[in-house]
Structures are given as C-alpha cells and as structure tokens.
A protein has these predicted regions:
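Short secondary-structure junctions and interdomain/linker hinges
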Residues: 13, 17, 29, 33, ...
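N-terminal first-folded block
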Residues: 5-40
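Basic/polar N-terminal segments that are highly enriched at the extreme N-terminus
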Residues: 1-5, 113-115
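Amphipathic protein-protein interaction modules
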Residues: 41-91
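Long, compositionally biased
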Residues: 88-115
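Short acidic/histidine-centered micro-motifs embedded in hydrophobic/aromatic stretches
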Residues: 25, 29, 72-76, 96
Length: 115
C-alpha cells in the first residue's frame, strides 16, 4: 500500500487499520535500522520491539496525531489494550497513551525512505 493510501484509510476508518498492514506499509516504503528508543518510562534497546520502533518512527515522519498513531497498532490497541484497561501487556502502547509524542525519543534514525 502506498503511504498516501494508508494515510487516507487511517483518517477515514482508523478502526479498520491492522498492525500487519501498518508494518507492511512501512517496510515497502522505508529502510529500517534497529535503534534504541525511549517511550515514556520504558527504554527499548536496538532490535527490541522493532515493530513499535518502526511504527513510531513512521508516525513521527508522517506527523500523525497520538490517536492516529495508536490506531496504527490495530487490534493490539482497539481490542487488547482498550479491552483491558488495567492490563500490563503492550507496554509501548500503554506508555504512549500516557506520555504521547513528548515521551518518544529515538537514539538514532530508524527509517530512511527507499530510493
């Protein structure tokens, strides 16, 4: 899927986005370099939680809102996190819900557009 088509779908029907679709869009349009990143009070080492790293880096490049970024996690957000508000799974999603973009810090460049 092109970035434009993905963004249009995200803006029109965010609840239909899947995590797999998000990652496929990222991987077809960007070269990924594993990098450490901070998400609120959670530190993710390089190569750790690469899916979240790709998603957050993509969302930052595309200047997505916090709500749009959370929707990119698909069922992990809409069903597993919102369906279990007191749960402890998916800490990157839960931390981002609390700290938003102010809590995201990358130690290096994670995504570079493919030539």
């Amino acid at each position: 899927m092109t970035i434009q088509a993905f963004i249009e779908k995200l803006k029109k029907t965010p609840e239909t986005i899947t995590f797999t679709e998000t990652i496929a869009t990222v991987e077809s349009n960007y070269e990924f370099t594993p990098t450490a990143f901070q998400n609120g009070n959670q530190h993710n080492g390089a190569g750790e939680n690469s899916g979240s790293c790709k998603l957050f880096a993509f969302a930052k490049i595309q200047q997505l809102t916090q709500a749009e970024t959370l929707a990119c996690f698909g069922a992990y957000y809409f069903e597993e996190v919102l369906g279990d508000p007191e749960g402890t799974n998916h800490q990157n999603i839960r931390n981002f819900m609390k700290s938003g973009w102010d809590g995201i810090k990358f130690e290096d460049v994670a995504l570079v557009p493919k030539a």
